Amino acid sequence: MNGADFKGSDIRGCDFGQAQLVGANFERARTGQTRRQVFLPLVVAGAFALALAYGLSQMVFGALGQTPEQSAWMSVVMLHIFSGLAGVGSASSALFGWGGRVGRAGIYLSGVCSAALTGFFYLGSYFDQNLKAAIAGAVAGAGLAVVFSLIAKKPMGVIIPAMGAIAAYGFSFLVWTAAIAHLSARQYIWGVGLGALSLVYVWFAICSLQAVGRGVSQLIGTSFRGANLTNAQFDQGNLKNTDFSKAIGR
């Protein structure tokens, strides 16, 4: 495609990776994301978030009133641990970004814990509340989250914060019910402390939802990765969400 004329063209969503575009004209070309590229990650993220939301709601309401003496107590403990870690991991990634170690660790932690929660509920429910099956589901879910985080980093930057927001809100609800119970028993220090923690996790959920929007905006639309762009013209081009990594310039 050397010398090709794309003047004024709409090339959103096009992949020019490794292409020979010497002297090509992209004057006033429009790059970036198509509507499909914007909405598809949102739809996928919404589907995963809804799956987690349903499972989490069932586990949260099932956990209310459980005591350490009951057989389901281990599930309650795992619910608190995984939802709490997923919420704080997603929020740390939203606050510190993917660039730093804290942000990267947070997004992986949130993805693993959110997927573990989902696998824990659905496989455990399929095998009639069997704890061993639920644990196997949690391990499988965590493993899949790691794999997808490595091979699809950009889409997971939308999916994981969406699931992290759900997990954070679920943990907030759990802690809030515990806070009310302590306040009702006149254990004010515990009640106030847990109430404050619940509000912190509401904020974590909001941060995660904001990260979903940022994740969509960072998805690559037009790609020139590895392309030969020697003497290519981009005058007055609207270059948004465009990948020029490893491209050859002048």
Please name every model-derived segment.
Residues Y108-L109:
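Interfacial transmembrane-helix boundary/kink motif in multi-pass membrane proteins
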Residues L40-R101, S114-L117:
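Core alpha-helical transmembrane segments of integral membrane proteins
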Residues V76-F82, L131-V139:
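Structural signature of hydrophobic alpha-helical transmembrane segments
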Residues W98-A105, P155-M156:
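Membrane-interface helix-boundary motifs at transmembrane edges
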Residues M1-Q58, T67, S114-L123, L131, ...:
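Tandem repeat scaffolds
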Residues S83-A91, V139-A145, V200-Y201:
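Hydrophobic cores of alpha-helical transmembrane segments in multi-pass inner/ER membrane proteins
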